[in-house]
């Protein structure tokens, strides 16, 4: 095992248009096969669409969507004496943001709209209003943690 400890977290550079690290993270989640320019174009177009549809600042819409999607609890498998328990644990803030963005992008890709810009825009708007598949995923995760609360004493 390495003795140096974990690698330090590198700071995220805020994106040039909205000056927000959250938008940079969203671009990184959308990015496929190194095509950053395409990912940025998609995200900026989706955020502009959010501005037109909702009439509010797109970064505020994104933050509201993230607040509705970020989980506070999740379950982790823990093996105790031959049995595997689903143990509820609190989610660290950085992981909560990562999970929230991952779910937003995953469920945006699964939507039925024609273009990715429309899919991402509508998923963001739905999530900011407390609707959509990403919010449902968070509710399911919390429900799972709630139903396994009896195993919380196995936490590590």
Curated annotation (Swiss-Prot):
Q: By its UniProt entry, which InterPro entries does this protein fall under? A: Ribosomal_uS7, Ribosomal_uS7_bac/org-type, Ribosomal_uS7_CS, Ribosomal_uS7_dom, Ribosomal_uS7_dom_sf
Pfam families attached here? Ribosomal_S7
Q: List the disulfide bonds.
A: none
**UniProt-listed SUPFAM superfamilies:** Ribosomal protein S7
Query: Which organism is this protein's natural source?
Result: Salinispora tropica (strain ATCC BAA-916 / DSM 44818 / JCM 13857 / NBRC 105044 / CNB-440)
Q: Relate the protein's function as given in its record.
A: One of the primary rRNA binding proteins, it binds directly to 16S rRNA where it nucleates assembly of the head domain of the 30S subunit. Is located at the subunit interface close to the decoding center, probably blocks exit of the E-site tRNA.
State the GO CC annotations. Answer: small ribosomal subunit
GO molecular function terms attached to this record: rRNA binding; structural constituent of ribosome; tRNA binding
Family membership: Belongs to the universal ribosomal protein uS7 family.
Q: What name does this protein carry?
A: Small ribosomal subunit protein uS7
Q: What PROSITE patterns does the annotation carry?
A: RIBOSOMAL_S7 (PS00052)
List the NCBIfam families. rpsG_bact
Subunit text = Part of the 30S ribosomal subunit. Contacts proteins S9 and S11.
GO BP term (any one): translation
Q: Which UniProt keywords apply?
A: Ribonucleoprotein, Ribosomal protein, RNA-binding, rRNA-binding, tRNA-binding
Q: Which HAMAP family match?
A: Ribosomal_uS7_B
């Amino acid at each position: 095992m390495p003795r140096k400890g974990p690698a330090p977290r590198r700071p995220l550079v805020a994106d040039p248009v909205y000056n927000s690290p959250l938008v940079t993270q969203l671009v990184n989640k959308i990015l496929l096969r190194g095509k950053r320019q395409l990912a940025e174009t998609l995200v900026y177009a989706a955020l502009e669409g959010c501005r037109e549809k909702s009439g509010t600042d797109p970064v505020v819409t994104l933050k509201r969507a993230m607040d509705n999607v970020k989980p506070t609890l999740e379950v982790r498998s823990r093996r105790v004496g031959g049995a595997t328990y689903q143990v509820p644990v609190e989610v660290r803030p950085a992981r909560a943001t990562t999970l929230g963005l991952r779910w937003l992008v995953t469920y945006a890709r699964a939507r039925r709209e024609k273009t990715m810009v429309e899919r991402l825009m509508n998923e963001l708007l739905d999530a900011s209003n407390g609707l959509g598949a990403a919010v449902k995923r968070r509710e399911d995760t919390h429900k799972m943690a709630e139903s396994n609360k009896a195993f919380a004493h196995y936490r590590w």
